[in-house]
Amino acid sequence: NLPELISIFKEAADIQTSDMLNLPVPEAEFINEVLKPSEEQQDMVAAFSERAESVRAGMVNPTEDNMLKITNDGRKCALDQRLLNELLPDAEKSKINTCVENAFQVWEEGKADRTTQLIFCDLSTPKGDGTFNVYDDVRNKLTEKGIPKEEIAFIHEYNTETKKADLFAKVRAGQVRILMGS
């Protein structure tokens, strides 16, 4: 059915790619950081290993614990240990704090040109229920450093095409300088 759908779509659509239009596109800069785990994260990883051994040995009911749950907990732990336990400390050299430092530095360096940066995070999106999430933590830390709150937006807060168009206009104008999304 897909080939037929594409054929019908092409009858009504005029498709132009950015290559065909020769549009100017700024060069993206990707920053990869290698960080050491906190002591709490090291303890959690050891616990994940023990859980995995129990699952492999069939000692745990799969509805209580399984490899998918362990993997998901590992992803959360790697991002921020507070995603597994909000009472754990905010590790000084965490991925979140490193991201905040980098984002603030880029924001400072781009003040004159009002440059924009995108931060992608597919875990811990804001739910609005008061639980810890990475998005609010990043925004709070950036505003504490002096970035105006209105210059930081979450794509999730713009849930219609009209709102998204307004957001992207603000991004292009340099009114929103940090956009977070998943």
Show the residue positions of the predicted features:
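Conserved helicase ATPase core of P-loop NTP-dependent helicases/translocases
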Residues: R139, P148-S182
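Phosphate/oxyanion-binding active-site loops and adjacent basic polyanion-contact surfaces
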Residues: L88-V100, G130-Y135
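Conserved helicase motor "Helicase C" RecA-like lobe of SF1/SF2 P-loop NTPases
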Residues: L123-F154
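A Trp-anchored, charged/polar loop motif used as the substrate-binding/catalytic surface
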Residues: K93-W107, E161-A165, A169-V171
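Short, high-confidence coil segments that cap the C-terminus of an alpha-helix
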Residues: A112-R114, Q175-V176
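Conserved RecA-like ASCE P-loop NTPase motor core of nucleic-acid helicases/translocases
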Residues: T115-L123
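Short, glycine/serine-rich, charged loops/turns that create anion-binding
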Residues: R75, Q81, L123-T125, N159
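Inter-lobe coupling linker of SF2 helicases/translocases
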Residues: N1-P89, K93, Q105
